[in-house]
C-alpha cells in the first residue's frame, strides 16, 4: 500500500518537473525558438487553434522565426494573435508567411527574466512539497501501520522530494545561464 503511495507521489513530482520544463521553454532568451509561440491561439474559422497546429514554424537563423500557415487566409489572424499574446514580438507578414525578428535582450530585460524564473521556481517547489505532504498524510491514514514504517516512508518521500527539488534547481540554473549569455 505504501509503495503505491510512494510511486504515485513520484509520478506527480515527475509531471510537475515536465510542466516546469515546458514553462521554461516558453521564456524568451534572445534566440529564436518556435516554443515561445506554443501558447498562441489563433481564431481559425470560428474556433481557437494553437498556432503550431495550423502552420509550420521554423528558425532558419538564430534571430528569426518564420511561420508558414497551411492556409494563407489565416495570416492576418495569426499576426493579430501573436500581438495579443503579449510576447514582445513584432511579426511582419507578406502574402505567404510571417517573419518574426528576435531582437537581442537588454541587460535589464535579462535580469527581470531571471527574477521571473526564480519566482516561478518557488511555485513549482511548493507543488513538489505539497505532493510530499499529501503522500505523508495518506501514509499516516493507513490503519495498523507501525510508527517505524511511517518514519521509513517519510524518509523515502523526503529523498524523492530532494531529488526533484534538485532537478528544479538544476533546470533553473541552466535557464539562468542561457538567459545571461549574450
Curated annotation (Swiss-Prot):
GO CC aspect terms: cytoplasm
SUPFAM superfamilies listed in its UniProt record: Ribosome recycling factor, RRF
Biological processes annotated in GO: translational termination
Reading the lineage from the top rank, the first entry is Bacteria
Q: Which UniProt keywords apply?
A: Cytoplasm, Protein biosynthesis
Report whether Transcription shows up as a keyword of the record: no
GO MF annotation, one? ribosomal large subunit binding
**Where does it mainly reside?**
cytoplasm
Its annotated compartments are: Cytoplasm
Report the protein's function. Answer: Responsible for the release of ribosomes from messenger RNA at the termination of protein biosynthesis. May increase the efficiency of translation by recycling ribosomes from one round of translation to another.
| Family per similarity comment | Belongs to the RRF family.
Q: What name has this protein been given in UniProt?
A: Ribosome-recycling factor
**UniProt source species:** Mycoplasma mycoides subsp. mycoides SC (strain CCUG 32753 / NCTC 10114 / PG1)
Amino acid at each position: 500500500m505504501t509503495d503505491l503511495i510512494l510511486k504515485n507521489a513520484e509520478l506527480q513530482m515527475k509531471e510537475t518537473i515536465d510542466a516546469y520544463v515546458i514553462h521554461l521553454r516558453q521564456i524568451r532568451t534572445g534566440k529564436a525558438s518556435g516554443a515561445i509561440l506554443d501558447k498562441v491561439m489563433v481564431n481559425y474559422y470560428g474556433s481557437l487553434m494553437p498556432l503550431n497546429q495550423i502552420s509550420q514554424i521554423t528558425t532558419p537563423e538564430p534571430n528569426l522565426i518564420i511561420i508558414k500557415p497551411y492556409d494563407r487566409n489565416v495570416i492576418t489572424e495569426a499576426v493579430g494573435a501573436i500581438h495579443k499574446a503579449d510576447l514582445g514580438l513584432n511579426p511582419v507578414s507578406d502574402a505567404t508567411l510571417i517573419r518574426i525578428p528576435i531582437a537581442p535582450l537588454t541587460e535589464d530585460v535579462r535580469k527581470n527574466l531571471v527574477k521571473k524564473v526564480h519566482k516561478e521556481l518557488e511555485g513549482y517547489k511548493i507543488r513538489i512539497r505539497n505532493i510530499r505532504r499529501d503522500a505523508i498524510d495518506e501514509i499516516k491514514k493507513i490503519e495498523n501501520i507501525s510508527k517505524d514504517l511511517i518514519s521509513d516512508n517519510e524518509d523515502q518521500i523526503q529523498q524523492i522530494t530532494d531529488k526533484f527539488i534538485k532537478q528544479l534547481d538544476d533546470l533553473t540554473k541552466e535557464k539562468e545561464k542561457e538567459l545571461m549569455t549574450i
